[in-house]
Every structure is written in structure tokens, then in C-alpha cells.
């Protein structure tokens, strides 16, 4: 699947699920990921629970629910590969500016390897 094409041509809602080192789970709404390679994405993450969890447990799932009838979308299984803290680099990835609504200046760019892709519903195998 061409992730760049998929996210450029889809409208929907993204949810990132993470867990801390003890397995305590969190889910949060996220914008479409930045596709940086064939199997690599990046997300801008503010200093909140999801970012803290990723620092202690590199695995996550990004669930994307396409807008429209039925249950269409994808689940991307992720593993953190890098974290960029330079504000100028982070800002280069921003699609829009909403002002600093809390933590924007402390946001990080987190890179993930996509280890598996499944449909929104079912096993897809």
C-alpha cells in the first residue's frame, strides 16, 4: 500500500493508541501522519501523555477511520525509530498554525516504522 497516496487522498479521523512501560493505555486524536518513506511516518507530538508513553514503550497503533458510510480505514502498527526536538525541523512539518495552544513550542517530531497494516475492521489476512 502506498501510504503517501492513501493519506493525501483520504479524509478521516486519526487516533493514536500508546501504552506506558506498565501497559497503561491511552488514545488520542491526531492529524494525518507525515509519510516520510515507504514504511515510515512521522507525527508531531506535544508534551502530553502519548509522547511520554512513546518515550517508555516504542510501540503504538495509529487507527484511521475514513469519512463516509460503513467502516473503512486502516490500522498502522508502529514502532518509534527516532525523535526530533529541533523546533525549526518540527515547524517544517506543520501543515497549519493554530497559535501556541499549549506545548506547541515544545512539540517533538516522532518517526515511526510501520511494521504492519491492517484494515479498520477484520484481520485482513
Give the location of each predicted region:
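Binding-site signature for planar aromatic cofactors or substrates
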Residues: 1-125
Amino acid at each position: 500500500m502506498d501510504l503517501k497516496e492513501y493519506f493525501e487522498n483520504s479524509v478521516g479521523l486519526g487516533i493514536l493508541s500508546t501504552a506506558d512501560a506498565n501497559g497503561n493505555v491511552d488514545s488520542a486524536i491526531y492529524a494525518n501522519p507525515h509519510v516520510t518513506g515507504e514504511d515510515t511516518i512521522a507525527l508531531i507530538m506535544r508534551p502530553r501523555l502519548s509522547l511520554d508513553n512513546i518515550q517508555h514503550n516504542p510501540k503504538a497503533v495509529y487507527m484511521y477511520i475514513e469519512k463516509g458510510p460503513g467502516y473503512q480505514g486502516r490500522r498502522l502498527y508502529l514502532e518509534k525509530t527516532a525523535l526530533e526536538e529541533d523546533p525549526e525541523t518540527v515547524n517544517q512539518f506543520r501543515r497549519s498554525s493554530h497559535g501556541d495552544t499549549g506545548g506547541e513550542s515544545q512539540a517533538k517530531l516522532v518517526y515511526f516504522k510501520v511494521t504492519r497494516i491492517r484494515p479498520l475492521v477484520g484481520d485482513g489476512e
